[in-house]
Amino acid sequence: MSPSLIDNYPTAGPAPTSSTSTKDTRPTIADQLIPTVRPSPPRYFGNMNTSLVESKFLTHPGDLGIVAVGFSGGQGKPGVDAAPAALFESGLLDQLRHDLGYNLHGHDAVHEYADLVPQHDPPHRGMKNPRAVSAVTKRIAEQVYAHAREGRLVLTLGGDHSIAIGTIAGTAKAVRERFAGRKEIAVIWVDAHADINTPETSGSGNVHGMPVSFLTGLARDSDEQFFGWIGDEHRISVSKIVYIGLRDVDPGEKRILRENGIKAFSMFDIDRVPIRSYGIGRVMELALAHIGADTPIHLSFDVDALDPMWAPSTGTPVRGGLTLREGDFICEMVHQTGSLVAVDLVEVNPRLGPAVDAAHDTVRAGCSLVRCALGETLL
């Protein structure tokens, strides 16, 4: 892993001039989107926070709320519930506390939510385990909200991607309350899959493929035990979600994306030939420009966005994905905006993988993504 240097970003005041300099100093989109690093100290660093980026929307940016979700009910492969413990055992919390200088809150245990999982949970509208997923995500929303309303950055470690119903709902509600309705969150969804199926368009019935449809209101149910607890205060606008890294999208999802004008960047956009190149840097500029510079951001990162070369231990791997460096860069760019308010890392499954070291490599990749999102720098 090689995070970007702070010196790569613009500083306050005019740049030094030189008669021999050939550097192009014209502002780019990234220059306009990424907060200026001023010579005076930012508002808050935490104990020894290495980030030099001033937070726009957090009153306590040095405080990090941790929600560890040991839940796998949104899909059918066991093991993803073991991811938070594996991330803890890898030393992630010590890295966040000692290397990045965060004050950690709520990080003592992995939540398994056994009290919320019914013994009998038949399908509803084709959804598998609907009562369990609904009840667990409601609890997660409450946990994330409790941190976010205090003005803390929130990190949720999953678990499968169905948990984003809860994480994003909790963030959305807290931001609306903290800013008296004047702000709504945007979501950057980094994933090989769109996860925007409705119960009716899903071929599998797995709810981890449906969270965005419930969060945007494209899928609804009046019964609280089937996600009826999601209210307007929990929802996000289709105009404030951006996908990055898509490469395995169901036919029904493609129709939903087109009909709703949802901004999405596939691997094709990232990999365009040089003469019409986007590349990950240009894609991030366009993604952030779409969101706007004055919008709180919730970053939801599915590790299967990475190519299986980098993250083999995940439930639905798809070849042809992001490199780890590209994934780290996405996280670094989002951090550099100063707009980040919440991060999810999901779908690490330590029990899956083609080789002995697969789980270790995937956990290590997940830790790298988290550290980059939370401000790790080389200098």
Which residue stretches match the model-derived regions?
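Serine residues within intrinsically disordered or low-complexity segments
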Residues: S2-S4, S18-S21
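PEST-like, low-complexity acidic/proline-rich intrinsically disordered segments
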Residues: M1-A12
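Conserved alpha-helical scaffold segments that buttress catalytic/binding sites
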Residues: P10-G13, D24-L379
